[in-house]
């Protein structure tokens, strides 16, 4: 590049950043692509909003059965723009699920799951399961009446599974009944385990799309 800066030259010599930029900037976009092919990208934007607003709320949320509800109340009433942060988190969560469902329908109806993109489809379905699990775990965190009974019902569902059902229920709840251990587990899953899992599968998903390209029309 003509008249490049010393900083640019330093990075170019070591990382060949111009080649990366050229590859990204010259990627061919098929002519059949329309607005419905943006649904996956919108889902990603919603996830980034979720990450940012969720991270902000961790500064005030207290994951204990005695203080969870009051900490959410404090966030909503006393923290500057706390009500807005939590509201955006809730709205974006609903939007993320909606965009994900529409994205799955678009991929299925256009045959994007067929060979050679089977693994891309598998990673996408895995991310859909994780996203729904986000909703289940996050619903319980305020630890109000709705959240408490929701987690009690959801954590009791595996009891119907033969042999390992009772073990899975106790693993989810952290004991025989719903309590502090349950809230701690759901908080850990919601704020640490699931975000990392989703990020890993997103990376795999995007790399496969990058390698194989966008599927063609039916």
UniProtKB/Swiss-Prot annotation:
Q: Which GO terms describe its biological process?
A: photosynthesis; respiratory electron transport chain
Write out the GO cellular component annotations.
plasma membrane-derived thylakoid membrane
* Subunit architecture: The 4 large subunits of the cytochrome b6-f complex are cytochrome b6, subunit IV (17 kDa polypeptide, PetD), cytochrome f and the Rieske protein, while the 4 small subunits are PetG, PetL, PetM and PetN. The complex functions as a dimer.
Where heme b 2 binds, per the record, is at 89, 190
Q: Where does heme b 1 bind?
A: 103, 205
Designated name of the protein: Cytochrome b6
Q: Which organism is it from?
A: Synechococcus sp. (strain CC9902)
Cofactor(s) the protein needs: heme b; heme c
The UniProt entry lists membrane topology as:
Multi-pass membrane protein
Q: How and how many cofactors are bound, per the record note?
A: Binds 2 heme b groups non-covalently with two histidine residues as axial ligands.
Kindly give the InterPro entries that the UniProt entry links to this protein.
Cyt_b/b6_N, Cyt_B6_PetB, Cytb/b6-like_sf, Cytochrome_b_N_euk/bac, Di-haem_cyt_TM
The protein's role, per its UniProt record: Component of the cytochrome b6-f complex, which mediates electron transfer between photosystem II (PSII) and photosystem I (PSI), cyclic electron flow around PSI, and state transitions.
Residues holding heme c: 38
């Amino acid at each position: 590049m003509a008249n490049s800066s010393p900083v640019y030259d330093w990075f170019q010599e070591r990382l060949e950043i111009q080649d990366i930029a050229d590859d990204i900037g010259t990627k061919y976009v098929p002519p059949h692509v329309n607005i419905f092919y943006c649904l996956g990208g919108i889902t990603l934007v919603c996830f980034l909003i979720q990450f940012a607003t969720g991270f902000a709320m961790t500064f005030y949320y207290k994951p204990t059965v005695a203080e969870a509800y009051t900490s959410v109340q404090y966030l909503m009433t006393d923290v500057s723009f706390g009500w807005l942060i939590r509201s955006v988190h809730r709205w974006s969560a609903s939007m993320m699920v909606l965009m994900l469902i529409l994205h799955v329908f678009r991929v299925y109806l256009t045959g994007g799951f067929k060979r050679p993109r089977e693994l891309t489809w598998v990673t996408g379905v895995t991310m859909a399961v994780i996203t729904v699990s986000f909703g289940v775990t996050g619903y319980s965190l305020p630890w109000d009446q709705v959240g408490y009974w929701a987690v009690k019902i959801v954590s009791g569902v595996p009891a119907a599974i033969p042999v390992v059902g009772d073990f899975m229920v106790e693993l989810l709840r952290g004991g025989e009944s719903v309590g502090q251990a349950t809230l701690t587990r759901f908080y850990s899953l919601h704020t640490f385990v699931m975000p990392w899992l989703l990020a890993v599968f997103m990376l795999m998903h995007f790399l496969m799309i990058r390698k194989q390209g966008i599927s063609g029309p039916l």
